[in-house]
Amino acid sequence: MVVEKNAPLQPWNTFGIVARAQTLVRVRSVADLHAVLADPELAPAPKWVLGGGSNIILTGDVKPVVLKMEIKGLRLVQETDRAWIVEAGAGEVWHDAVAWTLAQGFPGLENLALIPGTVGASPVQNIGAYGVELQDRFASLDAIDLATGQSFSLDAAQCGFGYRDSVFKHAPSEPTDGSSMPRGMGLAGRAVITHVRFRLPKPWKPVLGYLDLERRRIEAGVDQPTAQQIFDWVCDIRRAKLPDPAVLGNAGSFFKNPTVTPEQCTDIIARDPKIVHYPMPDGSIKLAAGWLIDACGWKGKSVGKAGVYEKEALVLVNRGHSQDSVTGGEVMTLAKAIQTRVY
């Protein structure tokens, strides 16, 4: 394992916020994790797991030991007549893993292309885009208990997946939005994911439920697009809407799309018939947060060096630069102001 003291965190968060970690450990294997948990200085200290840094806002220096997950590896672990089972190390860049599966002839993750972050973070957030969520393609994961050092595995039901939710976002005493996970099983701060396995179903079927993808299909003049075509379309759409963090610091889509009951949606539509909304499998209605923010006049506005992206209101951006970056406080002030106005 590689241990760094007073380590800069600006390179490790896509918003480009300046902060430091008192101790940062670059974890490149399961053995590295066990070494951390056996170290007399590191073992008793609080831990904080860091993947790609695309889903965090740093509001100050980090005192817990930062575990920078860099476990690599991509492989097909099983193939049946119904699915491919693919395993990826937690430190693999998510988009690279998606591209690898397609290159190997294992379609199914193409709608999730270009989502920032690492593989290990994907179950934590239950990432999703363009009609597909991680839980739709999830098989199982391996993790290590940070208190005991014991390894364990979880299947989809045990992960308690919900909308951008899982057991990894809840403390042990908190319930999750998932219907199959009992109270007392939250794993936030208690476990670190090392490997994730995906079940990619056969036969493959395209998911084209979103208008942007359907437009691309019509423009291409095809009835049944390939997985590679969908991958390319998703990448084009995301690049048109979302800024490159290397050029303009951001954390991707900052806000969750709110969900309401059908009755609430009917009331909202009566006030504004143009509101963008989508039915959900559980009977609720998802409202487009970006549309709501834009309708409230926030697109393009700023608070200090934190701003709302001109092309996509869901995205907050860093309008500072490396030597005079936005602060986490400015980002959170802007976010709270937007939430207050929308609600």
Q: What are these language model-derived features?
A:
Residues 2-148, 182-184:
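Anion-binding (especially nucleotide phosphate/pyrophosphate-binding) glycine-rich loop
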Residues 4-5, 10-17, 151-328:
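Phosphate/pyrophosphate- and phosphate-bearing ligand-binding catalytic cores of soluble enzymes
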Residues 24-28, 86-90, 205, 222, ...:
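Catalytic cores of large soluble enzymes that bind and process phosphate-bearing ligands
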Residues 29, 53, 117, 149, ...:
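Residue-level signal for inorganic ion chemistry
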Residues 36-40, 209-213, 334-339:
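Short amphipathic alpha-helices in soluble, non-transmembrane regions
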Residues 106, 328-334:
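Beta-rich strand-turn-strand
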Residues 341-343:
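Well-ordered alpha/beta subsegment
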